UniProtKB/Swiss-Prot annotation:
Domain of life: Bacteria
Purpose of the protein: Binds 23S rRNA and is also seen to make contacts with the A and possibly P site tRNAs.
Quaternary structure (record): Part of the 50S ribosomal subunit.
SUPFAM superfamilies named among the record's database cross-references: Ribosomal protein L16p/L10e
Protein name: Large ribosomal subunit protein uL16
Single GO term (MF): tRNA binding
Region (Disordered): 1-21
Length: 138
């Protein structure tokens, strides 16, 4: 699963996920992309599950790019622990997603196959997504 190799600080404040994606909002590497149209978080497990769904469907063909990286730690306290006594330990990592962000890209497969692979991957993600193709001249 994806997670940072090292971090300067183990824990991070919650923050607010606002605005729309300006960077990473167009297909840059592949021919087709899976674009999020909702705001939210993708965990490393969700990204990996979607990647596996795409890989299984396209079999040996094509090349896949993951355009997001889960670099934000989410901390949790253990079950049945009283309130207080500081912040919990980091349990998993998430990628903050703004509307318009491309999550996956693929090249080397026909459009119908890419569409179906992204449909299967979208079922693994908690956000609404749409299929996009590379613009002519990009």
């Amino acid at each position: 699963m994806l997670q940072p190799a090292r971090r300067k600080y183990r824990k991070e404040q919650k923050g607010r996920n606002t605005g729309i994606a300006t960077r990473g909002s167009s297909v840059a590497f592949g021919d087709f992309g899976l674009k999020c149209i909702d705001r939210g978080r993708l965990t490393a497990r969700q990204i990996e599950a979607a990647r596996r769904a795409i890989s299984r469907h396209v079999k040996r063909g094509g090349r896949i790019w993951i355009r997001v990286f889960p670099d934000k730690p989410i901390s949790q306290k253990p079950a049945e622990v009283r309130m207080g006594n500081g912040k919990g330990n980091p349990e998993y990592y998430v990628a903050e997603i703004q509307p318009g962000k491309i999550v996956f890209e693929i090249v080397g497969v026909p459009e119908e196959l890419a569409r179906e692979a992204f449909r299967l991957a979208a079922a693994k993600l908690p956000l609404r997504t749409t299929f996009v193709a590379r613009m002519i001249g990009q």
